[in-house]
Amino acid sequence: MKIAILSTDPSLYSTRKLLEAGEQRGHEVYVIDYLRCYMKITSMKTEVIYMGKSLKGFDAIIPRIGASKTFYGTAVVRQFEMMGVFTANPSLAISRSRDKLHCLQLLAREGIELPVTSFAHFTKDINSLINTVGGAPLVIKLLEGSQGIGVVLAETYQVAKSVIEAFSGLNANFLVQEFIEEAGGADVRCFVVGDRVIAAIKRQGTEGEFRSNLHQGGTAKKIKLTPQERSIAMRSAKAIGLKVAGVDLLRSDHGPVVMEVNSSPGLEGIETATGVDVSGKIIEFLEKNLGKGPLGDRL
């Protein structure tokens, strides 16, 4: 196969591992900076142009789109889709996953358990907004945040009120969410490829830190999922339309609840903690869907 990894930085662990996995299986793999691509859109011919040359003959792409570059990145993915190129994650699914509110709405529609969440534009009645999620302590999240940035734990009503007023004053869109205290600053990352959960880790925040993101200094260890956790992870990825996804769960007193569905989950933390060749599993997924196995299988 001829595969393009859409990434702005070829030195990133995830990008390097995907490149190595593809090449080890005999495929022709390129790292393409999607921000340097431009698109030719006509009724006669659709093209993606990179460094002055039309990108032709690709069988598949693996999008690794940065959160702050979602609009342009998904436009490039969509252009490849129009050219008939298979994508590990569809452009629409990536867009859904990046819109935290839309993502939660889609999950709720499928009956998937979530923390009680509230979203509002008119914030004069802050007391009612806070009470909607059960009062303080509660979590306030910027819709545009990622990797734990823009997430605040408000432990008292007064702190919650102050943060909401500050975000409102900045015209920022934010969610107010129930705080799952019993999770103890830990979450579960389930890595979904195709229709399977191939690996899972428990991420624990540093002492005094409720955010468990590895980017915030958290630690990770391999865990075994319950059948319920495995099912909810697969259902969540399917609800958003993702084929490669990191589904983040919290273990609450009433069962697992979904916090987020990530369309470009990092590979380093989960591969290091579990020993699972996640990169190779993603390449195998492309092979399965395109009917083109490793080069050795075709010689």
From Swiss-Prot:
Q: Does the keyword Transport apply?
A: no
Question: Pfam families from the xrefs?
Answer: RimK, Rimk_N
Give me the residues that bind Mn(2+) 2, please.
E260, N262
Under SUPFAM superfamilies, the record lists: Glutathione synthetase ATP-binding domain-like (SSF56059)
Q: Which InterPro entries match?
A: ATP-grasp, ATP-grasp_RimK-type, ATP_grasp_subdomain_1, RimK, Rimk_N, Rp_bS6_RimK/Lys_biosynth_LsyX
Q: Which cofactor does it need?
A: Mg(2+); Mn(2+)
Disulphide bridges, residue numbers:
none
Q: Where along the chain is Mg(2+) 2 bound?
A: E260, N262
- A single BP term in Gene Ontology: SOS response
State where ATP binds: K141, E178, F179, D187, R211, S212, N213
Q: Which cellular component appears as one GO term in the record?
A: cytoplasm
Q: Which UniProt keywords apply?
A: ATP-binding, Ligase, Magnesium, Manganese, Metal-binding, Nucleotide-binding, Protein biosynthesis
- Where's the ATP-grasp domain? 104-287
Highest taxon above the source species: Bacteria
Q: Does the keyword Amino-acid biosynthesis apply?
A: no
Q: How is the cofactor bound?
A: Binds 2 magnesium or manganese ions per subunit.
Hey, which family's this protein in? Belongs to the RimK family.
Q: What is this protein called?
A: Probable alpha-L-glutamate ligase
Gene transcribed to yield this protein: rimK
